[in-house]
Amino acid sequence: DGSGGASDAQKQHDVNYLLFKVYEDVNDENSP
């Protein structure tokens, strides 16, 4: 089922995006 793979890929993309946003926020807080 190809649709299942696409769904997993989308979930992985969402997770990566959320982690990226959190990483950005942490860097902003640590900036002088």
UniProtKB/Swiss-Prot annotation:
Coiled coil: none
Gene Ontology molecular function terms on file: oxygen carrier activity
Keyword Cell membrane appears in the UniProt entry: no
Keyword entries, A-Z: Copper, Oxygen transport, Secreted, Transport
Residues spanning the membrane: none
Compartment(s) of residence: Secreted, Extracellular space
Tissue distribution: Hemolymph.
Biological-process GO terms, alphabetical: oxygen transport
Keyword flag Transport: yes
Record's GO cellular component terms: extracellular region
Function: Hemocyanins are copper-containing oxygen carriers occurring freely dissolved in the hemolymph of many mollusks and arthropods.
Family per similarity comment: Belongs to the tyrosinase family. Hemocyanin subfamily.
Name of this chain's protein: Hemocyanin C chain
Originating species: Cherax destructor
